[in-house]
Protein backbone atom coordinates (compact mmCIF):
# COMPACT_ATOMS: atom_id res chain seq x y z
CA UNK A 1 0.00 0.00 0.00
CA UNK A 2 0.96 3.66 0.31
CA UNK A 3 3.44 2.98 3.11
CA UNK A 4 5.09 0.05 1.35
CA UNK A 5 6.25 2.16 -1.59
CA UNK A 6 8.19 4.34 0.88
CA UNK A 7 9.93 1.18 2.12
CA UNK A 8 10.73 0.22 -1.49
CA UNK A 9 12.26 3.64 -2.16
CA UNK A 10 14.40 3.48 0.98
CA UNK A 11 15.57 0.02 -0.12
CA UNK A 12 16.58 1.38 -3.55
CA UNK A 13 18.44 4.31 -1.96
CA UNK A 14 20.35 1.92 0.29
CA UNK A 15 21.10 -0.43 -2.62
CA UNK A 16 22.53 2.44 -4.68
CA UNK A 17 24.80 3.46 -1.78
CA UNK A 18 25.99 -0.14 -1.41
CA UNK A 19 26.66 -0.45 -5.15
CA UNK A 20 28.53 2.88 -5.22
CA UNK A 21 30.90 1.54 -2.55
CA UNK A 22 31.33 -1.77 -4.35
CA UNK A 23 31.75 -0.19 -7.80
CA UNK A 24 33.27 3.27 -7.18
CA UNK A 25 33.88 3.92 -10.89
CA UNK A 26 30.15 3.73 -11.63
CA UNK A 27 27.23 5.96 -10.78
CA UNK A 28 23.93 4.51 -9.61
CA UNK A 29 20.75 6.54 -9.81
CA UNK A 30 17.91 5.61 -7.44
CA UNK A 31 14.79 5.51 -9.57
CA UNK A 32 11.13 5.05 -8.72
CA UNK A 33 8.56 4.17 -11.38
CA UNK A 34 5.37 6.02 -10.50
CA UNK A 35 2.64 3.69 -11.75
CA UNK A 36 0.41 6.62 -12.61
CA UNK A 37 -1.40 4.68 -15.34
CA UNK A 38 -2.30 1.82 -13.05
CA UNK A 39 -5.73 1.33 -11.55
CA UNK A 40 -4.64 -0.17 -8.20
CA UNK A 41 -7.34 1.23 -5.94
CA UNK A 42 -6.67 -1.37 -3.29
CA UNK A 43 -3.00 -0.50 -3.24
CA UNK A 44 -3.23 3.26 -2.95
CA UNK A 45 -6.45 4.19 -1.20
CA UNK A 46 -5.87 2.69 2.22
CA UNK A 47 -3.17 2.55 4.89
CA UNK A 48 -3.07 0.57 8.10
CA UNK A 49 -1.14 2.00 11.03
CA UNK A 50 -1.03 0.36 14.43
CA UNK A 51 -4.13 -1.68 13.63
CA UNK A 52 -6.14 1.36 12.53
CA UNK A 53 -7.25 1.67 8.92
CA UNK A 54 -7.32 5.02 7.09
CA UNK A 55 -9.06 5.08 3.72
CA UNK A 56 -9.93 7.68 1.12
CA UNK A 57 -12.87 7.16 -1.16
CA UNK A 58 -13.16 8.36 -4.72
CA UNK A 59 -15.61 7.93 -7.54
CA UNK A 60 -13.13 8.35 -10.36
CA UNK A 61 -12.17 5.42 -12.57
CA UNK A 62 -9.25 4.90 -14.89
CA UNK A 63 -5.59 5.76 -14.38
CA UNK A 64 -4.85 6.41 -10.72
CA UNK A 65 -2.48 9.30 -11.39
CA UNK A 66 -5.17 11.36 -13.11
CA UNK A 67 -7.46 11.26 -10.11
CA UNK A 68 -8.04 14.50 -8.34
CA UNK A 69 -6.24 15.40 -5.16
CA UNK A 70 -6.51 13.03 -2.22
CA UNK A 71 -9.17 14.18 0.28
CA UNK A 72 -6.60 13.83 3.05
CA UNK A 73 -8.20 16.41 5.35
CA UNK A 74 -10.69 13.74 6.37
CA UNK A 75 -7.93 11.63 7.92
CA UNK A 76 -5.36 14.35 8.64
CA UNK A 77 -6.66 15.16 12.13
CA UNK A 78 -6.84 11.46 13.03
CA UNK A 79 -3.26 10.89 11.90
CA UNK A 80 -2.04 13.97 13.75
CA UNK A 81 -3.76 12.77 16.92
CA UNK A 82 -2.22 9.31 16.50
CA UNK A 83 1.28 10.80 16.19
CA UNK A 84 0.87 13.85 18.45
CA UNK A 85 3.89 12.90 20.59
CA UNK A 86 6.19 12.26 17.61
CA UNK A 87 7.81 15.39 16.15
CA UNK A 88 9.31 13.52 13.18
CA UNK A 89 5.94 12.04 12.27
CA UNK A 90 4.35 15.50 12.50
CA UNK A 91 7.03 16.84 10.15
CA UNK A 92 6.30 14.08 7.62
CA UNK A 93 2.57 14.81 7.92
CA UNK A 94 3.31 18.49 7.24
CA UNK A 95 5.21 17.53 4.08
CA UNK A 96 2.34 15.26 3.06
CA UNK A 97 -0.22 18.02 3.63
CA UNK A 98 1.88 20.55 1.70
CA UNK A 99 2.32 18.15 -1.22
CA UNK A 100 -1.24 16.92 -1.49
CA UNK A 101 -3.25 20.02 -0.59
CA UNK A 102 -2.58 22.09 -3.70
CA UNK A 103 -1.87 19.39 -6.26
CA UNK A 104 -4.08 19.08 -9.32
CA UNK A 105 -3.97 15.28 -9.26
CA UNK A 106 -2.49 12.27 -7.52
CA UNK A 107 0.56 12.10 -9.81
CA UNK A 108 1.66 15.67 -9.07
CA UNK A 109 0.98 15.28 -5.36
CA UNK A 110 2.93 12.03 -5.05
CA UNK A 111 5.88 13.29 -7.09
CA UNK A 112 6.06 16.42 -4.93
CA UNK A 113 5.92 14.36 -1.74
CA UNK A 114 8.66 11.98 -2.90
CA UNK A 115 10.99 14.78 -3.98
CA UNK A 116 10.49 16.56 -0.67
CA UNK A 117 11.28 13.37 1.24
CA UNK A 118 14.02 11.88 -0.94
CA UNK A 119 15.15 14.47 -3.49
CA UNK A 120 18.33 15.27 -1.58
CA UNK A 121 19.35 11.60 -1.99
CA UNK A 122 19.14 11.82 -5.78
CA UNK A 123 15.85 10.00 -6.26
CA UNK A 124 14.46 10.22 -9.79
CA UNK A 125 10.71 9.69 -10.18
CA UNK A 126 9.55 8.47 -13.59
CA UNK A 127 5.92 9.06 -14.49
CA UNK A 128 4.70 6.28 -16.80
CA UNK A 129 1.95 8.57 -18.08
CA UNK A 130 4.31 11.33 -19.24
CA UNK A 131 3.57 12.27 -22.86
CA UNK A 132 7.26 12.75 -23.78
CA UNK A 133 8.16 9.35 -22.32
CA UNK A 134 5.35 7.76 -24.30
CA UNK A 135 6.69 9.41 -27.45
CA UNK A 136 10.05 7.71 -26.88
CA UNK A 137 8.22 4.44 -26.28
CA UNK A 138 5.95 4.62 -29.35
CA UNK A 139 7.86 2.11 -31.51
CA UNK A 140 7.83 -0.42 -28.67
CA UNK A 141 4.09 0.04 -28.17
CA UNK A 142 3.53 -0.45 -31.90
CA UNK A 143 5.56 -3.66 -31.82
CA UNK A 144 3.52 -4.86 -28.84
CA UNK A 145 0.22 -4.01 -30.50
CA UNK A 146 1.03 -5.68 -33.83
CA UNK A 147 3.20 -8.63 -32.74
CA UNK A 148 2.49 -9.36 -29.05
CA UNK A 149 6.23 -9.05 -28.39
CA UNK A 150 5.93 -9.03 -24.60
CA UNK A 151 3.99 -12.29 -24.58
CA UNK A 152 6.64 -13.91 -26.78
CA UNK A 153 9.56 -12.76 -24.62
CA UNK A 154 7.88 -13.58 -21.31
CA UNK A 155 6.81 -17.01 -22.59
CA UNK A 156 10.42 -17.74 -23.59
CA UNK A 157 11.66 -16.64 -20.18
CA UNK A 158 9.06 -18.72 -18.34
CA UNK A 159 9.99 -21.75 -20.45
CA UNK A 160 13.64 -21.23 -19.56
CA UNK A 161 13.35 -20.36 -15.86
CA UNK A 162 9.72 -20.91 -14.85
CA UNK A 163 10.22 -24.13 -12.94
CA UNK A 164 12.68 -22.40 -10.59
CA UNK A 165 10.61 -19.28 -9.93
CA UNK A 166 7.07 -18.49 -8.89
CA UNK A 167 5.33 -16.59 -11.69
CA UNK A 168 4.27 -13.19 -10.32
CA UNK A 169 1.98 -12.03 -13.12
CA UNK A 170 0.45 -13.60 -16.18
CA UNK A 171 1.21 -12.02 -19.51
CA UNK A 172 -1.61 -11.29 -21.93
CA UNK A 173 -1.67 -11.23 -25.72
CA UNK A 174 -1.51 -7.42 -25.72
CA UNK A 175 -0.12 -5.68 -22.66
CA UNK A 176 -1.38 -2.19 -23.40
CA UNK A 177 -4.33 -0.11 -22.22
CA UNK A 178 -6.42 2.61 -23.80
CA UNK A 179 -6.64 5.56 -21.44
CA UNK A 180 -9.20 8.31 -21.56
CA UNK A 181 -10.86 10.72 -19.20
CA UNK A 182 -12.06 8.63 -16.29
CA UNK A 183 -11.48 5.21 -17.90
CA UNK A 184 -8.75 2.65 -18.51
CA UNK A 185 -9.51 -0.26 -20.85
CA UNK A 186 -7.34 -3.20 -21.82
CA UNK A 187 -6.65 -3.43 -25.56
CA UNK A 188 -7.82 -6.82 -26.79
CA UNK A 189 -7.17 -8.37 -30.20
CA UNK A 190 -10.45 -9.35 -31.87
Give the label of every model feature segment:
Residues 1-190:
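N-terminal targeting/trafficking signals and adjacent low-complexity tails
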Amino acid sequence: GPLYFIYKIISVLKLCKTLEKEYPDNNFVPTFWLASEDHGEGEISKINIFGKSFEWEHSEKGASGKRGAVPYSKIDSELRELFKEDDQAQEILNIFTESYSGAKDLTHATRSYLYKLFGEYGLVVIDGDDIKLKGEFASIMKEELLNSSTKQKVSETIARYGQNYKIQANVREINLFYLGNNFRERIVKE
